[in-house]
A protein has these predicted regions:
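ABC ATP-binding cassette signature C-motif
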Residues: 1-254, 313, 318-324
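Short coil/turn segments at secondary-structure boundaries
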Residues: 104-106, 138-139, 287, 303-307
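A short, surface-exposed helix-loop junction/capping segment
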Residues: 116-123, 266-274
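Short, surface-exposed loop/turn segments at secondary-structure junctions
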Residues: 153-154, 277-281
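Intracellular alpha-helical coupling/juxtamembrane segments of multi-pass membrane proteins
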Residues: 246-271, 284-298
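Alpha-helical coupling/stalk and coiled-coil linker elements that connect catalytic or binding modules
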Residues: 269-274, 280, 292, 308-314
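Short, flexible cytosolic linker that couples an ABC transmembrane/permease module to its adjacent nucleotide-binding
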Residues: 300-318
Length: 324
């Protein structure tokens, strides 16, 4: 069952079509890598999924009450985050719903007239959602993403650009939405933080769509791949390496089909000219009709694009190099 679906979604910016009637669905527990050349529309897709932008045509269908978290390439924080006295408190604002539940539990405890079953139900939900371990999880997340204990007590207003991105990621980890959307999340992570994030994403039960140029990261975290190419979306099963093999096989088949079709078109053009020169117009019209059908169905050979061959993060300058 899908929790989010792109239904014939088209997105245009001025005269340019960025996405053209794309179709795709995210199921509960999916971990999807979103790949394609720079400018293909990956960020646009993530913003549409998050509801930050609206499609020009088509619909983004979301499951009712679906919680969505988006990590943009440039972090933007709300007033609650920026007003926090320190980084640890700021990151904790990602779990504001748990703090609200804790206040409700405290109110129940002060009011002896509250039904015991209502209190027990709320307490159980609070425990299942990790309320009793929230402080430990905040500290573990900050440590995992490379923040030292000294940095935990710094005000969020003093964060650098890279620190802001890591802080935004930490807050999303604590929020733990049903659908996590990440746009180039490895950009400001060292190797230890990168490996911590990979392990976290593999463990979490929620769904994930991540746009990244880091092949090793995608191999470590995703089980499906969406490829954006020429304004269209194509899905593949498996990690990045499996996708790359499937894409190469598909491109070889497409190139062969395009070559065969080009030969057929050339042959029909030759016959049209031959019958025209001999004034055999009935035959000429017959082959003109065949030629029109072939040209209408014409398949182009896949275009080779160096940008589409995703580099390792070290080559792209987007993260740490790895061995192995």
């Amino acid at each position: 069952m899908s929790i989010l679906r792109f239904a014939s979604v088209t997105r245009e910016i001025g005269a340019f079509v960025i996405l053209d009637a794309i179709e795709g669905a995210v199921a509960l527990g999916d971990r999807i890598g979103l790949v394609g050349p720079n400018g293909a529309g990956k960020t646009t897709m993530l913003r549409l999924a998050a509801g930050r932008d609206e499609p020009d045509r088509g619909t983004v269908v979301r499951k009712r009450a679906l919680s969505i978290g988006l990590l943009a390439q440039e972090a933007h924080f709300d007033a609650a985050f920026m007003a926090a006295p320190d980084l640890r408190t700021a990151v904790r604002t990602g779990a504001a719903h748990l703090d609200a539940m804790a206040e409700e539990l405290a109110a129940f405890e002060r009011d002896g007239r509250v039904a015991q079953h209502a209190y027990a139900d709320l307490q159980h939900r609070y425990e299942v959602l990790g309320g009793y371990t929230l402080d430990q999880r905040v500290e573990a997340t900050l440590s995992g993403l490379g923040f030292t204990r000294d940095e935990w007590v710094r005000p969020p207003t003093g964060l650098s650009g890279g620190e802001q991105t890591r802080a935004a990621l930490a807050r999303l980890v604590i929020a733990d939405p049903d659908l996590l959307l990440l746009d180039e999340p490895t950009n400001h992570l060292d190797l230890d933080a990168l490996e911590w994030l990979e392990e976290h994403l593999r463990r979490r039960s929620g769904s994930l769509v991540v746009a990244s140029h880091d092949r090793a990261f995608l191999d470590a975290t995703v089980t499906r791949v969406w490829e954006l190419r020429d304004r269209r979306l194509t899905g593949f099963r498996g990690d990045y390496s499996a996708y790359h093999r499937q894409r190469e096989e598909r491109d070889v088949r497409a190139a062969k089909d395009a070559g065969t079709q080009a030969e057929q078109i050339a042959r029909e053009q030759e016959l049209v000219q031959r019958y025209r020169s001999h004034r055999k117009f009935s035959k000429m019209h017959e082959h003109e009709a065949r030629l029109e059908r072939l040209q209408a169905e014409r398949r182009e050979a896949p275009r080779q694009s160096r940008r589409l061959a995703l580099p390792h993060s070290a080559l792209a300058g987007g993260g740490p190099a790895r061995s192995g």
